[in-house]
Design a protein with these regions (language model features):
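Sequence signature of WD/YWTD-type beta-propeller architectures
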Residues: 1-186
Length: 186
């Protein structure tokens, strides 16, 4: 966490992929998600009071069956993921996207007022992935990258002035993924 007190992580220790927090020394481990499904990719807000993550939650009996069969093999099928926010202790959890496909790699903007995430929701074939910005309640989804490939894993410099993301743009057809850094001016 930005306040230097907690770590957030995904673990299978309870028989499902859930989020946990703990102190930096490994003490006070607490499970903070409990619904069946694949919870992961969590980040704390800049003030350490909120968390954001992506989850794939099976909803139908068939989805649950497939999820459990894959999980038993140590696999997941993260093709349908949505973005969630909660208090840092996991309370008041809310799904804030309902746009379908894979919405993942969410992170808070430096001011804590928006969430940036990767998604393929606009594309029939599930590709490309671009970056989108939205308010904390999921409203105002705005596309901020316009590449025909893969843009994901948004992050910010500690001072909030630089924006960093991974992309396979400009790779000469090699499928290499590189880091890109630019000024953040929101």
């Amino acid at each position: 966490s930005p306040d230097g007190k907690k770590i957030i992580f995904t673990s299978t220790r309870n028989g499902d992929l859930d989020l946990y927090t703990m102190n930096l020394d490994g003490s006070d481990v607490r499970q903070i998600t409990t619904e069946l499904g694949y919870d992961g990719g969590a980040w704390f807000s800049p003030d350490s009071k909120k968390i954001v993550w992506r989850a794939s939650r099976p909803t139908t009996d068939e989805d649950v069956k497939v999820y459990k069969e894959l999980y038993a093999q140590g696999l997941v099928m993260p093709t349908q993921m949505e973005v969630f926010v909660a208090n840092a202790d996991g309370s008041d959890a809310k799904q804030i996207t309902r746009i379908g496909k894979a919405n993942w790699a969410p992170n808070f903007t430096p001011d804590g007022k928006h969430i940036i995430f990767a998604s393929n929701h606009e594309y029939e074939r599930g590709f490309p992935f671009n970056l989108y910005l939205m308010k904390l309640d999921g409203n105002g989804v705005t596309k901020i990258s316009h590449d025909g490939g893969f843009d994901a894993f948004p992050a910010f410099s500690p001072d909030g002035k630089k924006f960093i993301f991974s992309s396979n743009r400009n790779n000469g057809g090699t499928h290499a993924t590189n880091l890109f850094i630019c000024d953040w001016i929101l």
